[in-house]
């Protein structure tokens, strides 16, 4: 299966999970010259930037382990651009990771912050 198809399926599952958990989905696949954010949601007034990673097994590690410092910096820069472009001020921002292994969803809240 193509990795982008698998990635979209993982993102669809993550969106469903977030909605069922009471999050409001603001955007999906927000792109800028800095990078891409998989999901931007709102949770009780907090803007939540979500990176989704999925794998079929943990044989070669957990999905979230593939997010390196370079990827984190790209996510942060893209999030800053998003907030500026949408003129969002005065709201808390949180960076989460949703890791999916064999249809099991693990939600890692506050995975990193703007000072990373």
Curated annotation (Swiss-Prot):
GO molecular function: nucleic acid binding
SUPFAM superfamilies: Restriction endonuclease-like
InterPro entries hit by this protein: Restrct_endonuc-II-like, tRNA_endonuc-like_dom_sf, UPF0102_YraN-like
Cross-referenced PANTHER family: UPF0102 PROTEIN YRAN
Family statement: Belongs to the UPF0102 family.
Protein name: UPF0102 protein PERMA_0362
Organism encoding this protein: Persephonella marina (strain DSM 14350 / EX-H1)
């Amino acid at each position: 299966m193509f990795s982008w198809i698998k990635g979209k399926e993982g993102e669809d599952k993550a969106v469903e999970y977030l909605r069922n958990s009471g999050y409001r989905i603001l955007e999906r696949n927000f792109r800028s010259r800095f990078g891409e954010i998989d999901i931007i949601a709102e949770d009780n007034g907090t803007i939540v930037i979500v990176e989704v990673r999925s794998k079929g097994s943990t044989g070669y590690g957990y999905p979230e382990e593939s997010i390196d410092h370079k990827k984190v910096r790209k996510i942060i820069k893209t999030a800053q651009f998003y907030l500026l472009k949408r003129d969002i001020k005065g709201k808390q921002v949180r960076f989460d990771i949703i890791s999916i292994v064999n249809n099991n969803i693990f939600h890692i809240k506050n995975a990193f912050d703007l000072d990373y």
